[in-house]
């Protein structure tokens, strides 16, 4: 009897200690964060045999983009949170965001006007249902209230957000405001993820998260037109579905993650082959639009190699039968790189990144461009096909807490898959501040 009492008493003490530890760390009821990012890009003249409507301009160019975002959040009840993100954006991309499938500025996807524009980027509700396991403390961050959550949990997100907020994450290559800035490095370039011209959508996502694995699914709205700003309200007919499985592992005691993604988009997309059949010379894919499905998938791996060094790899594919609709004109992609913190040279918060990308097209897509067809981002009027290859490197200098300055270089071989144009070098500077 005394032994049972002692065990119960020890259990009571442990529970009290756990509660006391939780009391030492605050649980936020509301939060306010912000960011601003200024990116300037330059490329000089480069060789070209010809150009078309969607070509990268061969003469010298300098363009700048700016965004500023406010991240406001509030806890409604246990597990229930709401977030609002008003955003300011201004600027233009090189050549009007044309002429390179793996475009050079990941921030410009959110910029649709040279004038300063205020809009709502996100307004979403998140409900977390605890399923047990060790309690974890989550630090305060953008769109994340500080507090405790179960190691195993079910997370429901509903409203206006970005698909990239939830899917295809990567510790080393996902955020153009602080990491690599090429479009094909912020996510799987062959995933035509549902989004308006600013990179956001409406929809619902559900995540089952456990200590060693996670399963995610989402149903998201597509734009009404290719690369358009208004979303298609026919949600039962036009939408994008995505499923992702994530598995954590350790390689020689170093953490890593592998993610498998599959998607199917349903939208009013045209067919490359139908456009060619209707007009073998100068085909117009917009004349063949009807409700169609695009399918694809991707592999995403991240691996810590040392305390200050990590590596990543992505591979992506889609069927390439219907026109690119929401992101960019990439049907196959392979990318990989490394990220090194500056502790080895006395700059622990600095980051050096180097990555390579190889993008490709389906046979239908390349035949369409070779016949003089145009998409919403590439098309030189004719095509001497070659894979678009890009090398990107950046150095991020931590000035003070929250403020970083970056220098970025991108070398692009066969821009827009055309051996008759380029190569071209793009230099970028980035100023990023967050609180």
Locate predicted features:
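Signature for the C-terminal beta-barrel architecture of outer-membrane proteins
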Residues: 183-311, 315-322, 329, 340
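Transmembrane beta-barrel strands of outer-membrane/channel proteins
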Residues: 32, 36-40, 84-88, 156-160, ...
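Residue-level signature of outer-membrane beta-barrel architecture
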Residues: 74-76, 86, 127-129, 160, ...
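Outer membrane beta-barrel transmembrane domains
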Residues: 246, 261-291, 319, 323-412
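Surface-exposed coil loops of outer-membrane beta-barrel proteins
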Residues: 98-115, 119, 132-240, 244, ...
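Outer-membrane beta-barrel "beta-signal"
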Residues: 121-134, 354, 423-435
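Short loop/turn motifs that connect adjacent beta-strands in outer-membrane beta-barrel proteins
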Residues: 21-32, 44-45, 73-82, 130-153, ...
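Hydrophobic, lipid-facing positions within transmembrane beta-strands of outer-membrane proteins
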Residues: 30, 64-70, 119-123, 154, ...
